[in-house]
């Protein structure tokens, strides 16, 4: 974390993946390092030099859970100032590549990784604002639509709103 002259943290860009399985469960991880140590979240982390947003999201999900995913649309952009950190986080909808191999294994800076039903979300101490992001993403995705901004030219660098009819 970089600190500016006035002792405020420089914003860091991060990514996270909202991943559902065939049983309509969400992939959650429990952080074992600050910020949000002990809280449940979705897999994610900071970009590394030279990475695209999509590459970073795929890498973070793999590093933290062992699962391979295909990163789809942007479903949320959140800003968090917590425990001396300042993050701007881009949340993506991500789909499992190998649905037969969907058992998450906690790795990296994660103490636990598991599939959780939406009905059980209230039983988990989630990071701020996450429950609403999960539920909104699920409602749109379950309705047969891919939520959020989409990748215009399939390069993982330019995302726009889908076409909308303003009648």
Residue ranges and their predicted role:
Residues 17, 74, 92-94:
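A structural signal for short, well-ordered beta-strand segments
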Residues 25-26:
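Hydrophobic "anchor" residues
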């Amino acid at each position: 974390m970089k600190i500016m002259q006035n002792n405020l943290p420089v914003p860091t860009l991060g990514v996270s993946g909202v991943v559902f399985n065939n049983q309509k469960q969400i992939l959650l991880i429990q952080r074992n390092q600050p910020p949000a140590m002990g809280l449940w979240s979705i897999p994610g982390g900071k970009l590394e030099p030279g990475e695209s947003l999509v590459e970073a999201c795929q890498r973070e999900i793999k590093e933290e859970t062992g699962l391979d995913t295909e990163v789809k649309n942007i479903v949320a952009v959140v800003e968090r100032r917590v425990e001396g950190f300042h993050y701007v986080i881009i949340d993506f909808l991500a789909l499992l590549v190998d649905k037969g191999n969907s058992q998450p294994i906690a790795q990296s800076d994660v103490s636990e990784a598991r599939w959780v039903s939406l009905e059980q979300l209230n039983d988990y101490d989630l990071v701020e604002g996450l429950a609403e992001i999960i539920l909104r993403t699920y409602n749109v995705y379950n309705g047969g639509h891919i939520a959020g901004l989409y990748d215009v030219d399939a390069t993982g660098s330019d995302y726009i709103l889908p076409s909308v009819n303003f009648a």
